[in-house]
Amino acid sequence: MIGAGINSLDDMNASVTAGVGAKRENSVPSSEGTRISIIVPVWNEASLIRPFLQHVRERAPETEIIVVDGGSSDGTAKLAETFADRIVRTRRNRAVQMNAGARAAGGDVLWFLHVDVELPAQCLDEIGRTLKDPNVAGGYFRIRLPQSPFVYRLTDSFAHYAGILLRMRCGDHGIFCRRQLFEDLGGFPETPIMEDVEFFRMLHRRGRVAYTRKRLVVSPRRYEEVGMLRLTLAYGLIATLYAGGVPLRVLRWLYARTCCSIKNR
């Protein structure tokens, strides 16, 4: 049920353990008096998790980091213990994982990040500036690929403004919002796909959703695995079908066959 995800039994049954990072003095609020909890859903990301978390510690030191593992078989959760404040273990479903992470979080602001992004400098200041406006329900970062070719920059610009028009943003954009509003909305709808877009639209119903001046740098790994043209066209098709009301189970089937490499299906 949309809006009921955060209280589901899957979240209630999630196990939570403290990471080594919990021992540091990170409980002091930022200069704005607001503590930010970063929630990272992962599955089999052993090669990325430690360098990513170390990067987050450097760019966003005054935050609580919660890694939510969806049943990894490569030791991802164990590797995360060095830098994370809490490790949450639950079943593999991004919405379930993010809701479980939100339940374990202690911050006033929840920031949902993917493990393959690079944070801009002063990212916490960007979030604080965005949420100063009481009419803003939440926010997100624009994204770019490292050393983006011109065709991708053109596609990104089109997708950005189309997303504003259609009120659609995915999890790559690092969506953030106040904890109280997240709880009022019931968290992410625990759907098989488009949970981030659904939640983004829920935020829009409660106020303006603003984007920051700085960008997240996202990994090109999926474009490299699937192919830039194929992935761009697939994303556009799925977004169009979603806007047209095609059932999510159909979109999930299409996504698995067009947006994932063979090894990840």
Task: Name each region found by the language model.
Residues I2-G19, K23-E32, R201-R265:
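Hydrophobic helical membrane-anchoring modules
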Residues N44-R59:
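Short, well-formed alpha-helical segments that are part of the catalytic scaffolds
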Residues S47-P51, D74-T82:
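Acidic helix N-cap motif at the loop->helix transition within catalytic regions
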Residues H55, D69-A77, V117:
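A conserved acidic beta->alpha catalytic loop
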Residues T63, A77-A104:
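Conserved donor nucleotide-binding strand/loop of the catalytic core
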Residues G75, V115-R129, R201:
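Acidic donor-binding/catalytic loop of UDP-sugar-dependent glycosyltransferases
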Residues L110:
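Short aromatic/hydrophobic "clamp" motif used to bind/position activated sugar donors
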Residues Q122-V151:
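Conserved donor NDP-sugar-binding/catalytic core segment of glycosyltransferases
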